[in-house]
Design a protein with these regions (language model features):
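N-terminal [4Fe-4S]-dependent radical SAM core
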Residues: 2-27, 37, 236-308
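Glycine-rich beta-alpha loop elements in corrinoid/cobalamin-binding modules
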Residues: 19, 45, 64-258, 265-266
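Conserved SAM/AdoMet-binding glycine-rich loop
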Residues: 32, 48, 67-68, 346-495, ...
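N-terminal pre-triad scaffold of radical SAM enzymes
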Residues: 36, 296-323, 348, 356
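Terminal amphipathic helices with adjacent charged low-complexity linkers/tails
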Residues: 69, 198-247, 260, 269-272, ...
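Flexible glycine/acidic-rich beta-alpha junction loops that bind and position SAM and/or redox cofactors
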Residues: 92-101, 149-151, 181-186, 210-214, ...
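Conserved, mostly hydrophobic/aromatic
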Residues: 173, 280, 315, 340, ...
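Intrinsically disordered, Lys/Arg-rich low-complexity segments
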Residues: 609-614, 618-685
Length: 685
């Protein structure tokens, strides 16, 4: 097996003119630009593309997080011979910069010291424009997640509008969508051979802009940018056409008119076969961030992946809110056992390896092969059909034996103490396996105290719109997990990922979920609101209010208050959420749940707040601040001056939160009566 020795690589690719000259280079062939700090690890797209081009014999420089106020950083190496390959980063720059509430984030795990601000908003577009400004005559190939998900006209959550393809906005010559290795190598070879970029229009896995007279002979067309920006039904229909043509076997060329020109999406590139994946992951990565970041606090994103191994790509899970099916695709491919074991063996020789491999996984850890034989001949099913939801397809091939053999080999390596699985297990696929050997060994050897799983919700309607299996499947998995953990003598826990406000999720659904969590003694710490990122079916539903496969209306919670109520219900047990939880339960006429879901501490706080609101006068000032004054009932007129008010500490004029006295503690008997009143409120109705 090539590169199966214990060699640890230490040489980074050039990041400056001085690095070039140290290698004796006068000119680079290509510059690879990335939105993340330079981390030479195969979990980072910039590292894969730059090492792949290096392996093809090209002179490569890496321009990581260039200064974006002008184009001078793009001239750092001098003019490259053939062009630029640009990516926005591992995470969409807008998701990296803003929370789902559109609040700016201060942190960025992919930047030096974990600090935000090192990349611009919409970094893929900004970097492309700067490269074109620096060298207008050089080709720019734009790839990566951010570009892939914006290749068609798309709804932009942050501007709350529909934008044209990133090909139009950025000015890139070619958009490379998907994982990109095949496209990168072919484009580089053709540019190096002297072919003009304008004629490179037939590469699978790429998009380009052209005029009507130069469209390909055969294609399927979806509604254009102006149409989908003004007609939500047209947007939903276009979404279905795009999703139905992302398979390498059954997909067709898709055309969509933008402002003036037409976007042409060629069929997706073929996934890398096993030996090709092995080759990519055997490239000489240093597996660490560049030393220039050491004094800045390093790059936090390396912590979890430095001693993790990617064993597969693609996911046939088909979650509607997930970007993987539009980027990596639904066909699963995987590396050979020898390749994975060789990478693990190399890790054991690294100086800071402590014996723990954090993960052997991928988009879904326990997928190793395509979901069925039919897809190899006819392609993946279209029309919104899922391999695993609402039930497991009868054609599904369920087999964990190959994955299990790999885990056994790695955990037997000298120097390896534990091998964990942290990238997520698809529990419905696991439960479909009649052989529970993998499940037993998962519990025995590969859980680091907690196992991440993603039921996401429990309401049937919401799960259907998510593309997730019914909650009964998760219940069976949960019961078996704890049963096997008990037999193994281990105290281990499930960490369920849950989502609020997904299209289709009503307030009643959120209350149903809170009741489910209470009855199952679950207190999730990791919850999130649905984040409408470009390129997903769920985002289409969020924007249009329609199911793109049926065109039937879908309820979408878009108000800030409604979203806050749904999120609070997921963490009903937190006293800080008491007011929102009580309000939600009253709105849904489920007051019977108040004494169960709302802690006594939270109920008392809500009662005190209500009493204060009833016994206070509020004056709102012109600057938006307000003053709270006690309502002196029976002690003078409402127009009584401040000087005549009772002695004591007075609210500061204009204070946003005026001080108030702490109420005296009630006798225990009175408090018990109040608690009893909460519990019997439903009966009194």
């Amino acid at each position: 097996m090539e590169n199966s020795t214990s060699q640890v690589y230490t040489e980074f690719l050039p990041i400056s003119r001085a690095d070039m000259e140290a290698r004796g280079w006068d000119q680079l062939d290509f510059v690879v630009v990335g939105g993340d700090a330079y981390v030479d690890h195969p979990s980072f797209g910039t590292a894969i593309i730059s090492r792949l081009l290096e392996a093809e014999g090209y002179k490569i420089g890496v321009l990581a997080q260039p200064r974006y106020t002008d184009c001078e950083d793009f001239k750092r190496f001098g003019k490259p011979k053939y062009g630029f390959f640009i990516g926005g980063g591992n995470v969409d720059s807008m998701v990296s910069h803003y929370s789902v509430a559109k609040i700016p984030r201060a942190e960025d795990e992919y930047s030096p010291g974990g600090k935000g601000g090192a990349r611009p908003d919409r970094s893929a577009t900004v970097y492309t424009k700067l490269a074109k400004e620096a060298y207008p005559d050089l080709p720019v190939i734009l790839g990566g997640l951010e570009a892939s998900l914006r290749r068609f006209a798309h709804y932009d959550y942050w501007l709350d509008t529909v934008l044209p393809s990133i090909a139009e906005d950025s000015g890139a010559d070619i958009i490379s969508f998907g994982m990109g290795e095949h496209q990168t190598v072919e484009i580089a070879r053709r540019l190096a051979a002297g072919e003009p970029v304008s004629s490179i229009t037939d590469v699978d896995g790429t998009c380009y802009l052209t005029d009507f007279d130069h469209l390909p002979e055969r294609y399927v067309e979806c509604a254009g940018y102006k149409k989908v920006a003004s007609d939500k039904t047209a947007y939903a229909k276009a979404c279905r056409i795009q999703m139905d043509n992302q398979d390498v076997v059954s997909g067709q060329i898709v055309v969509q008119k933008q402002s003036e020109k037409y976007l042409v999406q060629n069929i997706p590139a073929k996934p890398l076969v096993r030996w090709e994946l092995d080759k990519v992951y055997a490239l000489p990565y240093t597996r660490r961030y560049h030393p220039i970041y050491e004094d800045m606090g390093g790059v936090p994103a390396i912590r979890e992946v430095q001693f993790s191994i990617i064993q597969n790509r693609g996911c046939f899970g088909g979650c509607n809110f997930c970007a993987i099916q539009l980027h990596q695709g639904r066909r699963v491919t995987s590396r050979s056992a020898d390749s994975i074991v060789a990478e693990a063996e190399r890790m054991t020789h690294e100086p800071d390896f402590k014996g723990y491999i954090h993960d052997i996984g991928g988009p879904t850890a326990n997928f190793r092969f395509p979901s069925c034989r039919e897809q190899m001949l006819r392609g993946m099913c279209n029309g919104g059909k899922h391999c695993l939801a609402p039930t497991t397809c009868s054609h599904m091939i369920v087999d964990h034996s190959d994955y299990l053999k790999i885990l056994r080999r790695v955990r037997e390596l000298p120097g390896v103490k534990k091998v964990f699985i942290r990238s997520g297990i698809r529990f419905d696929y696991l439960m479909a396996d009649p052989d529970d050997t993998f499940f037993k060994e998962l519990v025995e050897y590969h859980v680091s105290g907690q196992l991440k799983v993603a039921p996401e919700h429990c309401a049937p309607n919401t799960l259907a719109y998510m593309g997730k299996p019914p909650i009964q499947t998760f219940n069976k998995f949960k019961d078996k997990f704890y049963e096997l953990s008990k037999k193994a003598g281990k105290k281990q826990y499930l960490v369920p990922y849950l989502m609020s406000s997904h299209p289709g999720s009503t307030l009643n659904d959120a209350v149903y979920l809170a009741e489910y969590l209470y009855k199952n003694h679950m207190r999730p710490e990791q919850v999130q609101d649905f984040y409408p990122t470009p390129g997903t079916v769920s985002t289409c539903m969020f924007y249009t209010g329609l199911d793109p496969y049926t065109l039937k209306p879908v309820f979408v919670e878009k108000t800030a208050e409604g979203k806050a109520l749904q999120r609070a219900l997921l963490q009903y047990y937190e006293p800080r959420n008491a007011e929102k939880v009580i309000k939600a339960l009253k709105m849904t006429h489920r007051e019977d749940l108040i004494p169960l879901l709302v802690p006594a501490e939270g109920r008392r706080a809500v009662q005190r707040s209500a009493r204060r609101a009833e016994s206070a006068e509020v004056t709102i000032h012109n600057d938006g601040t307000y003053t709270v004054r006690p309502n002196q009932k029976g002690k003078g007129s409402r127009n009584q001056s401040r000087s005549a008010a009772p002695a004591g500490r007075q609210p500061s004029p204009g204070a946003r939160f005026a001080p108030h006295s702490v109420p005296g503690k009630k006798p225990k008997s009175i408090q018990q009566k109040e608690n009893a009143a909460w519990k019997t409120s439903k009966k009194k109705k």
